[in-house]
């Protein structure tokens, strides 16, 4: 159980390796990271037997930016027939699990294996329950089986409350037909990622005001309108008629980087294609000056040193808020619907809700 296995967006294996190595060094967990380019996964192999468990115990999964899912465990080679007996053998020394997820990688090979996983899950679940290895209990660890092929699986464990919200970290969101662009799913996923479901009524409701910087044609505005908010859309480009017809949107032809609201708004969202450092200073201004209470903003990533750049900008924002003596929580994740970008969520903790 000395390997930490992580899923990620294909092409971001290096970022996962850099990020987990940094955390491991800070926590004094010895080991090395490896990830094949475009494989959609990376590993951190610990030199001590309890290394992976220590990492998962000391870190919150939500702190990690690039991994989509994680599990501690080991690879198991499977025979062509009677895979279940081999898995049961390996599970004998592990704790009884409280849930089971079968996962595949976000690659063409992974997609081909998903049918096999669907068929295999039913008999496997029955066998695990019969053997007393699987019970229905959220407090127990989750058993995560990531199939690399029909003959090779990563047999891993993770705590249900300290791992991805969805299998492989991939949300099943349906594209709403009336939304003006596919980017709408990025913001919807961000709500799920950063705001506990039981707080949606309180933090995303129709008494609120929102601003969408760089709004055209309105993919992100659509999500704010769907929650019943009054939205100011800032963009020199056109907005979708369907959004304007709701009567909830005011469209101002202005530059998203210079426009400011007269009063504090509840939400600012921004998905502008711009150098990440410029977007980061925009975030600093909006939260630092109390122009908004919460924000979801995308940072577009450079081609190289992507983890280092994100880390630098997050540290800079944190230092900026400290200097201004304002309390802001900062979270950052590469969402499933993100491409060469990460999504930041920020919240002023010292502003009274309206």
From Swiss-Prot:
NCBIfam families, per the entry: PRK11760.1
Enzyme Commission number(s) of this protein: 2.1.1.186
Record flagged with keyword Cytoplasm: yes
Catalytic residues (UniProt): 300
Annotated protein name in UniProt: Ribosomal RNA large subunit methyltransferase M
Enzyme class: transferase
Function: Catalyzes the 2'-O-methylation at nucleotide C2498 in 23S rRNA.
Keywords carried by this UniProt record: Cytoplasm, Methyltransferase, rRNA processing, S-adenosyl-L-methionine, Transferase
């Amino acid at each position: 159980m000395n390997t930490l296995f992580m899923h990620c967006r294909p092409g971001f294996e290096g970022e996962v390796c850099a990020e987990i190595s940094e955390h491991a060094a800070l926590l004094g967990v010895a080991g090395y990271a490896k990830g094949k380019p475009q494989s959609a996964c990376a590993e951190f192999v610990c030199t001590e037997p309890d290394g992976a468990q220590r990492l998962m115990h000391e870190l919150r999964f939500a702190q990690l930016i690039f991994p989509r899912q994680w599990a501690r465990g080991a690879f198991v080679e499977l025979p062509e027939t009677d895979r279940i007996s081999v898995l049961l053998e390996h599970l004998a020394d592990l704790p009884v699990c409280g849930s089971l997820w079968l996962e595949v990688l976000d690659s063409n090979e992974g997609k081909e294996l998903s049918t096999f996983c669907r068929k295999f899950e039913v008999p496997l679940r029955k066998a695990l329950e019969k053997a007393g290895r699987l019970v229905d209990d959220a407090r127990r660890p989750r058993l995560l089986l990531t199939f690399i092929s029909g003959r090779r699986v990563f047999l891993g464990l993770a705590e249900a409350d300290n791992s991805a919200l969805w299998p492989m970290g991939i949300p099943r969101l349906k594209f709403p037909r009336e939304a003006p662009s596919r980017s709408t799913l990025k913001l919807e996923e961000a709500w799920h990622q950063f705001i506990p479901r039981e707080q949606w009524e309180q933090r995303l409701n129709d008494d609120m005001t929102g601003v969408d910087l760089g709004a055209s044609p309105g993919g992100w505005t659509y999500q704010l309108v769907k929650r019943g908010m009054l939205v100011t859309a800032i963009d020199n480009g056109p907005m979708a008629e369907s959004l304007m017809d709701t009567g909830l949107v005011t469209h101002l032809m202005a530059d998203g980087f210079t426009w400011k609201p007269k009063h504090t708004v509840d939400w600012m969202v921004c998905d502008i294609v711009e150098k990440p450092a410029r977007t980061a200073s925009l975030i600093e201004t909006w939260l630092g000056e109390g122009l908004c209470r919460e924000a979801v903003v995308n940072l577009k990533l450079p081609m190289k040193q992507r983890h280092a750049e994100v880390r630098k900008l997050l540290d800079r924002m944190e230092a900026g808020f400290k200097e201004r003596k304002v309390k802001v929580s900062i979270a950052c994740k590469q969402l499933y619907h993100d491409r060469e970008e990460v999504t930041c969520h920020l919240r002023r903790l010292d502003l009274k809700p309206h």
